[in-house]
Amino acid sequence: MEYKETVKKVIAEVCRLLLGVVFIFSGTVKAVDPMGGAIKIGDYLTSFGLDKLQPFTVLISFNLSALEFMLGVCMLLGVYRRYTTFLTLLMMSFMTPLTLYLAIFNPVSDCGCFGDALVISNWQTFYKNVVLLAAAIYVFIHNQRLLQGYTYHVYWFVALWSYVFAIGFAYRNYNHLPILDFRPYKLGANIPALMSIPEGAPEDEYAYSFIYERDGVQKEFSLENYPDSTCLLYTSPSPRDM
């Protein structure tokens, strides 16, 4: 019986450590570039037809990074164990099916969960969230087995400090260049070198098509089978990816 209890505590602590580290990292890299996070949130809103919320993207970006950072700190330190594990489970219960939808239908190129610091595919994001959801379920069920780093009387200070710190850090990076710039064209980068195409890399190919009309009949032509002058141009040429 004592052995089983020890195993449960160890598993709970491992899950707590995993969730805490991931949430702190995710919140930090979002706060590093809150404007980039706002742009990504705007992509989400456009994909789901919620353009009316576009004016609030920066506000959402600030608070999302602060919430993730606060939950990560509280998870690691055992602060408000019941509420922290519940909010973490609630967030993962929302994010996991959302990332499954992204993986299947691909409305945005990447989820942006780790900003520009670590770009992963939508399927990789979904698999990551499945693991985090399982860990969140376990720590929520066994939250009383988690060790506490502080007494109950200072819980509010730890939670408030972590949230305010993340907001202040994001605000600083919003008004100045990021302290840690993960973007490809950051200050000091060689832009011509970054824009060059590596040797042997596949290049884009384009095909031009023209729609001409003769005797009321419209036909599409390419540059290879261009018609004679008796046809009238119906639409101007437009390139398309091959």
Spell out what each predicted region is:
Residues M1-T6:
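Short, Lys/Arg-rich, polar N-terminal cytosolic tail immediately upstream
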Residues S93-L146:
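Membrane-embedded alpha-helical segments of integral membrane proteins
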Residues G149-L177:
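Internal/C-terminal transmembrane anchor helices
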Residues L77-T84, Q144-H153:
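Membrane-interface helix-boundary motifs at transmembrane edges
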Residues Y174-L194:
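Alpha-helical transmembrane signal-anchor/signal-peptide segments
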